[in-house]
Amino acid sequence: MGILSERDRAAVTKELERLAGPVKLVVFSQELMAGDLCRQNEQLVREVASLTDKASVEVLNLAIDRERAQAYGVDQVPAIVVEGVRDYGIRFYGIPSGYEFANLIDAMLVASTGEPVLAAATRTTLATLAGDVDIKVFSTPT
């Protein structure tokens, strides 16, 4: 049995039709640290990716694939890296369920284009920043 209902699968499929290019979802798991959560996270990601031919999934083990985890800056599980033609630094820690699920789909859409949807004024302001900014959003399960 899947995580997504038929209604949700239909809605997500429609949203994913907007993908402009390929998206890769790199899932980091580790059975010993968070087995149930990692399995649910992987199942959710595989279900989402199965709804479009533009999404692929790669599952890595945090302990075994340490070099890859370090390269992505991932040090917790479950984790999802959302990549388009390159790594834009989009990470999800924990299972993106509830309201966070829509953010996963939005992240896939943004990664597929390589261009965030920002107002011109926002782009101008961001261009004045002297360096990279690390933005973290924390949420509680819904």
Model-based region annotation:
Residues 45, 69, 104:
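Contiguous, structured surface segment used for ligand recognition
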Residues 7-52, 127-142:
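Local sequence-structure signature of Cys/Sec-based thiol-disulfide redox active-site neighborhoods
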Residues 111-129:
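Long, charged amphipathic helices and adjacent flexible linkers at domain junctions
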Residues 34-39, 65-71:
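N-terminal beta-loop-helix "entrance" segment that forms/cooperates
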Residues 81-116:
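Non-catalytic, surface beta->alpha helical segment in thiol-disulfide oxidoreductase systems
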Residues 53-65:
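Thiol-based oxidoreductase modules, predominantly thioredoxin-like and allied folds used
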Residues 22, 66-91:
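Structural micro-motif
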